[in-house]
UniProtKB/Swiss-Prot annotation:
This is Pyridoxine/pyridoxamine 5'-phosphate oxidase. The keyword Transferase does not apply. Its cofactor is FMN. Keywords: Flavoprotein, FMN, Oxidoreductase, Pyridoxine biosynthesis. It comes from Mycobacterium avium (strain 104).
């Protein structure tokens, strides 16, 4: 089977002056643009890591915070991705907005966020999501979905009399500090726009 491509050419050309206010401001704008365009989970990003035996691995996670220090996501610290990051604390992420013909690629060193940062985010999660984090031993095998739902029922009963569900001991956030950020915008004839930010240097790349 052969696949074609869709070229987007309906928006102004991406240029270096779009980054006058920094890469964070432009990334926020593009996430907002995706949300306004009806993209499901506009803050979804593909996280790429390296397994302890040196193999690539990727999965989709949600960007939950974005500022000049980098981007933050949250997960189970006993998950496969956490094992990867313990072995190689460096990662890459890609925000793919196919409907808009845009993507942003970012990579850099990864570190765990503070307990306070985790607590602040945890307090904003719906109770059901909090209970789900307690119920799931992420990346571990389980016999059936029924068994998973039974684990959820058990933790729901456990915290039934608790006004507040505490943060699980093995759960928290990671911060990816951006070494390199690249903005990509599809154009006709495959002459796509690429702008790379490395520290204070902003430069256009050939497609």
């Amino acid at each position: 089977m052969e696949y074609g491509s869709v070229e987007k050419d309906g928006s102004p050309d991406l240029d270096v002056d779009w980054l006058d206010d920094g890469w964070v401001a432009l990334l926020r704008k593009w996430i907002d643009d995706a949300e306004r365009a009806g993209v499901a989970e506009p803050n979804a990003m593909v996280l790429a890591t390296v397994t302890p035996d040196g193999r690539p691995a990727s999965r989709t996670v949600l960007c939950k915070s974005l500022d000049e220090t980098g981007i933050t996501f949250f997960t189970n610290y006993d998950s496969a991705k956490a094992d990867d990051l313990a072995a190689t604390p460096y990662a890459a992420v890609t925000f793919p907005w196919y409907q808009l013909g845009r993507q942003v690629h970012l990579r850099g060193p990864v570190s765990k966020v503070t307990a306070q940062v985790t607590e602040d985010y945890w307090s904003k999660r719906p109770r059901g999501s909090q209970l789900g984090a307690w119920a799931s031993q992420q990346s571990r095998p389980i016999a059936s979905r029924a068994a998973l739902l039974e684990q959820l029922a058990q933790v729901t009963a456990r915290f039934a009399d608790h006004e507040r569900v505490p943060v699980p001991p093995g759960w928290g956030g990671y911060l990816i500090a951006a070494d390199v950020v690249e903005f990509w915008q599809g154009r006709e004839n495959r002459l796509h726009n690429r702008i790379r930010v490395t520290g204070n240097r902003v430069e256009r790349l050939q497609p």
